[in-house]
Amino acid sequence: MFKRKSTAELAAQMAKLAGNKGGFSSEDKGEWKLKLDNAGNGQAVIRFLPSKNDEQAPFAILVNHGFKKNGKWYIETCSSTHGDYDSCPVCQYISKNDLYNTDNKEYSLVKRKTSYWANILVVKDPAAPENEGKVFKYRFGKKIWDKINAMIAVDVEMGETPVDVTCPWEGANFVLKVKQVSGFSNYDESKFLNQSAIPNIDDESFQKELFEQMVDLSEMTSKDKFKSFEELSTKFSQVMGTAAMGGAAATAAKKADKVADDLDAFNVDDFNTKTEDDFMSSSSGSSSSADDTDLDDLLNDL
């Protein structure tokens, strides 16, 4: 069942997890999401639970790429979840084309996105009271991740005490508050309450009930859940088209599209003055994609 553990042990586990950068995950069975009102606001009280496996951290970090281009979606888990940037065609595309420095718009579209996962006990859920007392998986973003870290990475020399918020006895409930600010969900007012034990946690039958509802988060990042580089490359090429070629090939493709656009822009009189030979080698048509909303909007946000 549950065991007490030191905050130093949790801090070390979280530091190891923090080495991974990037993604989001699609809808997951058993995931709890805060229901928002028509104004985009909502609140609940949850409790982060310890790991189901004593050797694993109580959190999981999953890195993904999710974007739409040329009318097609690319939504795949990224191998950088395990610190491997070479087995992801999107990461290679970003690196080879130096998108961070040369094309900020493209970089923002295809960059890695990170989702954090935990087992939680729903303490209070005003919008869905039927969830109260139940255990779910919960996906959250960096804002909440930073608040969890702030409870552990304290200044001991200044008299601050680190808190393992996942401890069933000495952890703390988390008040999740979401407010709509400038069209985005804002989590700034979310906070941890004072340390407290989960009610009835000393009852072994209650512990067992909670434990059996929890999932092994390490399975989410198991390498056998990730697609091969070849499979991902095929999908990436289908979505990106000529842009996936990168380098000189992509540049040539862009120039060809530019020529086609220029030809389309000729007026009829100019066209009539040209001979058939002038246009024998011309190509027509070009592809473009409009800006799309972030995939997190498609997945109803974090």
Swiss-Prot record:
Transmembrane spans: none
Name of a matching Pfam family: gp32
Database matches in SUPFAM superfamilies: Nucleic acid-binding proteins
Keywords tagged on the record: DNA damage, DNA repair, DNA replication, DNA-binding, Metal-binding, Repressor, Viral DNA replication, Zinc
UniProt-annotated binding residues for Zn(2+): 65, 78, 88, 91
Molecular function GO labels: metal ion binding; single-stranded DNA binding
Signal peptide: none
Location of the region described as LAST in the Swiss-Prot/TrEMBL record: 3-7
GO annotation (BP), single: bidirectional double-stranded viral DNA replication
Biased composition (Acidic residues): 291-302
Stored InterPro entries: NA-bd_OB-fold, Phage_T4_Gp32_ssDNA-bd, Phage_T4_Gp32_ssDNA-bd_sf, SSB_T4
Region (Disordered): 273-302
Bias-annotated ranges (Low complexity): 280-290
Subunit architecture: Homodimer in the absence of DNA, monomer when binding DNA. Interacts with the DNA helicase assembly protein; a ternary complex between the helicase assembly protein, the single-stranded DNA-binding protein and ssDNA is an obligatory intermediate in the helicase loading mechanism. Part of the replicase complex that includes the DNA polymerase, the polymerase clamp, the clamp loader complex, the single-stranded DNA binding protein, the primase, the DnaB-like SF4 replicative helicase and the helicase assembly factor. Interacts (via C-terminus) with the viral SF1 dDA helicase.
Similarity comment: family membership: Belongs to the Tequatrovirus single-stranded DNA-binding protein family.
Domain text: The acidic C-terminus is involved in modulating the ssDNA binding properties. The N-terminus LAST motif is involved in the cooperative binding of the protein to ssDNA.
Function: Single-stranded DNA-binding protein that participates in viral DNA replication, recombination, and repair. Coats the lagging-strand ssDNA as the replication fork advances. Stimulates the activities of viral DNA polymerase and DnaB-like SF4 replicative helicase, probably via its interaction with the helicase assembly factor. Together with DnaB-like SF4 replicative helicase and the helicase assembly factor, promotes pairing of two homologous DNA molecules containing complementary single-stranded regions and mediates homologous DNA strand exchange. Also promotes the formation of joint molecules.
Protein's name according to its UniProt entry: Single-stranded DNA-binding protein
Record lineage: Viruses, Duplodnaviria, Heunggongvirae, Uroviricota, Caudoviricetes
